[in-house]
Amino acid sequence: MHIVVVGLNNKTAPVSIREQVSFGEHEMKGAVVALRDEKSIFESVIVSTCNRTELYVVTDQPHTGRYYTKRFLANWFGLTMEELEPYLFIHEGFDAMKHLFRVTSGLDSMIVGETQILGQVKTSFFTAQKLETTGTVFNKLFKEAVTLAKRAHAETGIGENAVSVSAAAVTLAEQLLGSLEDKSIVVIGAGETGELTTLNLYEAGARDITVFNRTLAKAEEVANRFEGSAHSINEMQCGLLRADIVISSTGAKRAIIKREDIAAAQLFRSDRPFLLIDIAVPRDIEPTAGDLPGVHLYDVDDLTSIVQQNMAERMKEAAKIERRIEAAIAEFEGWMTTLGVVPIITELRDQSLKIQQETMQSLERKLPNMTNREKTVIGKHMKSIINQLLREPLSYIKDAAAKPDAEQRIAQFMDTFALDEELFDSAAEEMVLQEETTAERKAVNR
């Protein structure tokens, strides 16, 4: 069996394409089942977010798996293969597994180390699992990817440093003034950046937040979400009088807060420090306001340097996670190799079970007066003996599948236990395919 992923993301496709090729919640269930029902596909999981749509499949032949997965995606959204293919990426085997681990860990995200994608992958997997479109391979692979991602985030701290300007603004405020719980904070602008800033402030413990915006309704919408108050931007001067922190992010073409506005506010503020953080481009606050006594003014360039430093830290942590991923995939590939001998193990267990049943039937004929309890006790002991006898042979055959001379070892094993030769042919074919895939990957890496 082979793992293939076909998809597109923010690196390969513009938003105009991504919004066309996106599975909504209402269609996800039907889509993942329909994908599994395509020719040559045995397991399927679909991950679809605003930044990516990815189809993971287990297939018996990589080339047919690729083709039918691409065709399914094009047909589902009413596109031709020619229209869709320029925006697609395709990974197979090791590369497909590595991609899943990187996505789940947040290493493939626009903001490296973000955790939202972890929940999205989990939801996609659980949906597929409930619909029984996953099996032996994906049940193990996705669980291991999720487990590694959780552990990596907990142990490396990759998500701790702010890497967006709005988050960096809040981090800077905490560094300079300490806890935000008792601070009066003014947010100017209720657009996407202003809303994200308000969210970050609220999550940092701020509860005295006032949002100013040209459109009062938009200010109220943002403020109400975070227990704040809202005012028209025309009332901003009153907000400056009591604010400890001002974070501004409007789309104005010129400065909306003049030096004299800050100077006037300072007359009523005693000796309290006044922190102004301007994350707008063009700038919202006149730069000369920072020259006033007690005023500390930072602009987007100051924050960009913080973001760059933090991103460098995240990339160091990301490198640690990459090494964990490599180790996890190597272990998973070893497990995949043993799948080729699963039919042999099953046959050996079936033979043992048949012997147990025949022996039990013989005992019942010779000892017709046995009670049900006696039969149960004897049956349990027979099963225990068989399991103990099989433990070493089963351990041997699993290890043998990963050895250089696996084919010879398995043939000897089959001959020893008088197992069906067709099972050996199936196992040998699977191991050859796995070896070819590994050899191809190593050749590419060289």
Swiss-Prot record:
Chain positions recorded as substrate binding sites: 49-52, 109, 114-116, 120
Pathway where this protein functions: Porphyrin-containing compound metabolism; protoporphyrin-IX biosynthesis; 5-aminolevulinate from L-glutamyl-tRNA(Glu): step 1/2
Binding-site residues for NADP(+), renumbered to this chain: 189-194
Keyword tags: NADP, Oxidoreductase, Porphyrin biosynthesis
Domains as described in the record: Possesses an unusual extended V-shaped dimeric structure with each monomer consisting of three distinct domains arranged along a curved 'spinal' alpha-helix. The N-terminal catalytic domain specifically recognizes the glutamate moiety of the substrate. The second domain is the NADPH-binding domain, and the third C-terminal domain is responsible for dimerization.
Quaternary structure and partners: Homodimer.
Role played: Catalyzes the NADPH-dependent reduction of glutamyl-tRNA(Glu) to glutamate 1-semialdehyde (GSA).
Protein name: Glutamyl-tRNA reductase
Gene name tied to this protein: hemA
